Amino acid sequence: MLKAAVIGLQWGDEGKGKVVTYLSRRYDCVVRYSGGSNAGHTVDYGNFKMVHHLLPSADIKKQKMMYIGPGVVVDLDVLLEEIDQINNLIPESRSLLRISKQAHVVIPIYRDLDEKIDSSRANQIGTTRRGIGISYANRAMRCGLRLEDFETPARAESFLNEISRTWSIKFDVKMILDSLIEKYNKIRDLLIDSSEAVRVLKEKDLLFEGTQGVLLDVDMGTYPYVTSTNCSTTGIQPGFGYPVQVDKIFGVMKAYTTRVGEGPFPTELKDEVGENLRRLGSEYGATTRRPRRCGWLDLVLIKYAIETSACNALIMTKADILSGFEKIPICMGYKIGGKFYTQINNTAHLTEIEPVYEEIKGWKSLHSKEFDDFIYKIERELGLKFAYISTGPKIEEITEL
């Protein structure tokens, strides 16, 4: 059985959603294994667009299965809205979805706590403030609610009371519980025990959909300016709920770099060029609509992401956005304390470095020699080949190499 993963090699927003939808046609099921509604995967079907915050980005037109694993935290409001969307677009597509009963639930009060905590920091992280970090914190403290807890309302109520005590906050437990149970009942028929899901799925071809990117991974990313989970390949097994051997790991990278929120960004452009990239690439967060910070491609960080994720195939997106630039700078290394480095072992000192660029000739067309030279140069530097090049926003605008 085929097992593959699609992960981001930067700070998220690499275009993974479109890639997953395209690749899903070769697999039986797409699995979301981490994160929550802080993700935002935009899929352009041509006649309509869909932004997946929780639902896996499977091609629903091709009737591909979707599974939300126990490593995901579920906002029931967002989930119900997305289920309605896909069902309106493709009738009966709801039946393609299964959700782990062991997935934790984001309750409304988490969003308020998330905002309060981030606002009180001396150096704000810049979270999406959707309660994701609070959900994972409560899971670690063993007081978080799981979907299966609503099968026994008294059990769910006890967890809500524990949350109130743990965070020293008061809220109407009965009102929140009644609201959550009402929403839970709307998806009850889609729930499945993680162990049962594994029995069903382990004999199928699976595509694991990563969220955010390696540089936002809670352990391997630019800590503390990271998300709350292992969104790289290290999160697949716990997020799926079963040991699984992933054979193909597709690493998705933009032809340039973007970042939402705070944190170090060595190649950031704080000038008109950066603004131009943002405009041309429509670089605004799919979840928050915040403007993304933009900069040149950073091969040092890409190498780090490849190494820490065991990526073995590359996919480039948004190369078309750079068409028309006369020169394209690529960050080939860093100067740190007067010394030159082409690789780093961690991300702790990115604020202390000076990026070193090499300029290459730009291109007017993705069919030009100049663009081919750009691709070959990156392949040589990274020691990996590109499997696909995305040539536009629509699903079909992708070339297999």
Curated annotation (Swiss-Prot):
List S-S links within the chain: none
Q: Which reaction does it catalyse?
A: IMP + L-aspartate + GTP = N(6)-(1,2-dicarboxyethyl)-AMP + GDP + phosphate + 2 H(+)
Required cofactor names: Mg(2+)
Which Pfam family, an example, fits this chain? Adenylsucc_synt
Give the matching PROSITE patterns. ADENYLOSUCCIN_SYN_1
Enumerate the residues binding IMP: 13-16, 38-41, 128, 142, 212, 227, 290
What CDD domains does UniProt report for this protein, alphabetically?
AdSS
Where in or outside the cell?
A: Cytoplasm
Q: Give the highest taxon in the source lineage.
A: Bacteria
What protein does this entry describe? Adenylosuccinate synthetase
**Lineage summary:** Bacteria, Thermotogati, Thermotogota, Thermotogae, Thermotogales
